From Swiss-Prot:
Protein name: Cytidylate kinase
Binding sites annotated in the UniProt record for ATP: G12, P13, S14, G15, T16, G17, K18, S19, S20
Keyword Transferase set for record: yes
Organism: Rhodococcus opacus (strain B4)
Underlying gene: cmk
EC number: 2.7.4.25
NCBIfam families hit by this protein: cmk
Any GO MF annotation of the entry: ATP binding
Keyword NAD listed: no
């Protein structure tokens, strides 16, 4: 493999530190960064704005045809647009968070976004692609496949702390219930259920700080691809 090209597939459930770690890893590798979860959140926001019934997969599929969106791949910051509007903050809100599993489970939505993800990854040269089915479905031939995991309690604590920092209140029990709900939906959906690829490296971040995680991932990338730090 040419060291000028590198695709790192980064999978795992929400709350594992996946986004922060993926951005930092991309910067350390001199790579681009693609948050595929943000793509599903953009689609979900679009569906919500259209007032589509989330129980109607055909209506969801119809609403996302010609989705007017764009997403950047600069690891320095998020660039997500819907209808030309910066929606980086809105796609992280509670309404989108509660609806995204339903929208992402629609096969037509996944087909649309997976095609875009593959195109962006192939055009990037070096890239860290973050998601939930990157190593298994989107980029099964990725040079390096990593699966981040952590206990539901650890992930809920992190998200609750983030909510507090952003002024959204303290409700650990509700956050934990939502984490468990999303885990169940993501792991049991008929299309692209959340699971590690057979050849992925599992890294449990429950008790690790971000610097420790990055150190481990750089070692994995070096061992699997020959790309140094």
């Amino acid at each position: 493999m040419s060291t000028s090209s590198l695709i790192v597939a980064m999978d795992g459930p929400s709350g594992t530190g996946k986004s922060s770690v993926s951005r930092m890893l991309a910067r350390r590798l001199g790579a681009r960064y693609l948050d595929t979860g943000a793509m599903y959140r953009i689609a979900t926001l679009h569906v919500l704005r259209k007032g589509v019934d989330l129980a109607d997969p055909d209506a969801i599929a119809d609403a996302t045809v010609g989705l007017p969106w764009s997403i950047g791949t600069d690891p320095a910051g998020e660039q997500v647009l819907l209808d030309g509007e910066d929606v980086g903050e809105e796609i992280r809100g509670d309404a989108v968070t509660k609806a995204v599993s339903a929208v992402s489970a629609v096969p037509a939505v996944r087909e649309l976004l997976v095609a875009a993800q593959r195109r962006l990854a192939c055009e990037a040269g070096r890239i860290v692609v973050e998601g939930r089915d990157i190593g298994t479905v989107v980029l099964p031939d990725a040079d390096v496949k990593i699966y981040l995991t952590a206990s539901a309690e650890a992930r809920a604590q992190r998200r609750n702390a983030q909510n507090l920092a952003e002024g959204r209140g303290d409700d650990f029990a509700a956050v934990l219930a939502d984490v468990q709900r999303r885990d169940h939906l993501d792991s049991t959906r008929a299309v692209s259920p959340l699971r590690p690829a057979d050849d992925s490296v599992l890294v449990d971040t429950s008790e690790l700080g971000i610097d420790d995680v990055i150190g481990r991932l750089l070692l994995v990338v070096s061992e699997r691809s020959g790309v140094g730090q």
